Amino acid sequence: MTPNIHHDKILILDFGAQYTQLIARRIREIGVYCEVWPWDHSPEEILSFGAKGIILSGGPESTTSPGAPAAPQHVFDSDLPILGICYGMQTMAVHLGGATEAADKREFGHASVQVIYPDTLFSGLSDHPSEFRLDVWMSHGDHVSRVPPGFTITAATDRIPIAAMSREDKRWYGVQFHPEVTHTLQGQALLRRFVVDICGCQMLWTAANIIEDQIAHVRERVGCDEVILGLSGGVDSSVVAALLQKAIGSQLTCVFVDTGLLRWGEGDQVMAMFAEHMGVNVVRINAASRYFDALQGVYDPEAKRKIIGNLFIQIFEEEASKRKQAKWLAQGTIYPDVIESAGSKTGKAHVIKSHHNVGGLPEQMTLGMVEPLRELFKDEVRRLGVALGLPHAMVYRHPFPGPGLGVRILGEVKPEYAELLAKADAIFIDELHQADLYDKVSQAFAVFLPVKSVGVVGDARAYEWVIALRAVETVDFMTAQWAPLPYDFLSTVSNRIINELRGVSRVVYDISGKPPATIEWE
């Protein structure tokens, strides 16, 4: 019998920190289910959620400002263990009768925390055992200047006298540093101490248990009905296909729209993996000509994204309408999509780019929704894919934008540009694999620049196209640094592209970070 993997869980109340989702991922890695909710969620829902502990996240606001987000009273009335992180510790202190103040200087980066009192949270944790010190990551302007009644100061730094505090009888804890980031060396151990030892959660959130749970859920939900899935070849839809094939077999039909804007040979790879190897019923629609016709004369990146997304919906609808027995639509929605969707309702989110096929299918479609990954982060989806038997190379492939090469060809999209770019990109990726560099960068790809540069072919001058190479290193894709690939490697890639592809005279390497640049060029 499958254990109830949602029984023991943690609730994270989000005050707007950039690291909040990272807290959730770290807790999931421990093996415990958790969810992220806005800090001002309704008291009734927070209490009925059934969490075994609550974490108050960091945030960008100042507790010294009027109207700053405050820790809700009902959280402290719940008798649950509470861990406040950074702003979460500060709002806990203010709410319970302590005080905060603005620091003379922001404390950002590496810091050394001296453990003054080894309470349950800190007991046995140290990076320098003889001194009871922890190497941590700080990111704050305010700090707690007076602990609330009943609290004990448990740690300090050279800059702030209260770096952590606790009230053991209530199981309330606060840390000014960020245990969720890898720079805090004992961070994962500290979170495990809170989640497992203090809150008493069992570690049931594993790939094997998640698969069993979702198979049972899908079977119960869809019964004997047919399910239709838009298969893109990306990680999310591929894992959904593998999971549903295991759950309902021939009841699943996948629609694979070959846009002509995919990576080199990707369409054939998708068919070989799912239709031939796994026995999935896949309908392949060769729609390249429709996409290139629709994109003719279109130069604006946002317009291209919308055309590509809308045409996908149109083609998918056409195919779905042929399948009268289909009662359910499966999608690869993942947990960050759910969090961002909820966050956008606050009005604080800003659209930087239109995202392809995220909640894009029309509401008038009468199909029920099946979203077996909606509780999972991307790293969990990848682990699920491996557990389901998908090749490691497919599951851990670099991200690829929904509009595909359509946003890696600057300006107008033409078939000859797409073919040239796909081949150049394949050469770049092939060389990364051969040099054992592919897994050392977070994302790498080629970009087609619609400008011609003079070159020499034989004894003649030629004006031919320019290809840009882009490789970045990042933890969360919110910020990124360009990857310092070796010069001899870049030379090899450049020589191969220019020599093997007719029509390219120059290759350049993008050394822009994010910010100010985005990872994709469009």
Curated annotation (Swiss-Prot):
This enzyme's EC code(s): 6.3.5.2
GO CC field: cytosol
Residues bound to ATP: 232-238
Active site positions, chain numbering: 86, 178, 180
Pathway listed: Purine metabolism; GMP biosynthesis; GMP from XMP (L-Gln route): step 1/1
Domain of life the protein comes from: Bacteria
Enzyme type, top EC level: ligase
Keyword Nucleotide-binding assigned: yes
Classification via Pfam families: GATase (PF00117), GMP_synt_C (PF00958), NAD_synthase (PF02540)
GMPS ATP-PPase domain segment(s): 205-397
Keywords noted in UniProt: ATP-binding, Glutamine amidotransferase, GMP biosynthesis, Ligase, Nucleotide-binding, Purine biosynthesis
Function: Catalyzes the synthesis of GMP from XMP.
PANTHER family: GMP SYNTHASE [GLUTAMINE-HYDROLYZING], GMP SYNTHASE-RELATED
HAMAP family noted in UniProt: GMP_synthase
Subunit structure: Homodimer.
Protein name: GMP synthase [glutamine-hydrolyzing]
